[in-house]
Amino acid sequence: LAILLALAENQTDFLRTNANEMPENDSESKKKNITYYTKYYQTKKSIYDSYTHKDSETIFLGDSLTDYYEWGEALSDHEVLNRGIAGDTTTGVLNRIDEVVKAKPDRVYLLIGINDMIAGQPINKIETNYKQILDILKTRSPNTKVYVQSLFPVNTALTGHPLNNATIRDLNKRLEDLSNLYDYQYIDIYPELVEFGQLNKDFTFDGLHLNGEGYRIWTRKILSTYNTNEEAEK
């Protein structure tokens, strides 16, 4: 645990990494997939790959927003696996989707893409990667209920990153359309976190990640999907 915490503390978090810090001989495509170069990503992926696969109820799949939260405690009435990796991208998720599929989860809650945007990945490329993720889940795990979550707003005054909430909303609309295409449920939490067009400062310390109150809002939204489906199954 101490080693993992140290790696997390010292990781080259994609949310804070400038692609120009990569070696000069690296290609642009490698720069935009810098998540592969972090020891934290490699360590977490190897840990997940080492687990004996068993049928599971719920998997949360994503980046630091997922990774940082104690989903098992927040959803203590449900069997939950946290498959978040701080700094991850849509490409990183594609690189490790096999482990998720092998677990044969009843549900997958997917939140990914903000790090792609920070890296300057074109929206069309993010959408293409996302479609590949959903293709794999639909084809190889057809009984899994997939919940595509909207990207969260950011607070540009706090982040220090040139992120644009208008672009985030554009991507969210595309994710909603993909959800409909694959007959998956789209969870739009963006409106519940936004205030005056920005991530509500009461829900964040850095303008990008959530604090405890922000996670409480998110958890409430997730629980509503459990309750809705339980009622539908009665």
Please name every model-derived segment:
Residues S141-K145:
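A short helix->loop->beta-strand "cap" motif at the edges of active sites that frequently abuts
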Residues I123-I133, N164-N172:
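Charged helix-capping and loop-helix junction motifs
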Residues P153-K234:
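Catalytic His-Asp segment of secreted/periplasmic serine-dependent ester chemistry enzymes
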